[in-house]
Amino acid sequence: MISDIKKILYATDLSPNSAHAFRYAVYFAKKFDAEIIILHVIEGASQDAVKALELYMDKQYLKKTLEKREDHAVERLKNRLRIFCDKELTDDPEFVEKIGSIEAYRGYPAEEILKKTEELNCDAIIMGTHKRSSTYTFLGTVAKRVLRRARKPVFIIPLPKGMTDLSFYDD
């Protein structure tokens, strides 16, 4: 039996083209009357990088700096969501209420996406691919790992050829 999709995890890398994959998350949320959880994972620094930083910063300052980075990612996501809604959801301003939460974590992206999908009881995962060149779209290692290990449906959204959508661009 196919289970209902009531909660969608939309994983974003904050690239300007991520609006295209978010459109699919919005489409599915409307179609299934589902909630969207927006997730961004900040790749953790390598152990070598952390050790090098600790030579120049005390651990408390380093911890605060990393926390600020997470807060900044959440603020960027909120700003992008506002821009997207203002631009593309003028006919449905109440849709914003379907956004359950905006989450940002440090870690390995594929592992965090899979972990949060289970923790938050999401029924599906939506994420985009990276554009590698004008001749083909590259399915990134994060998408491959999620696709291989997920126990929920995963929708990988390719970027159409030549598309450069700056709907999320906020820099």
What is each model feature region?
Residues 1-3, 83-125, 161-166, 170-171:
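Structural beta-alpha unit
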Residues 59-79:
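A short acidic, glycine-rich active-site loop
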Residues 24, 73-87, 112:
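Short, solvent-exposed amphipathic alpha-helices that sit
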Residues 2-64, 171:
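Small/aliphatic-rich secondary-structure junction motif
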Residues 18, 106, 135-136:
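A conditional alpha-helix N-cap/helix-loop micro-motif detector
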Residues 4, 115-165:
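Gly/Ser-rich helix-loop-strand patches that form or flank binding pockets
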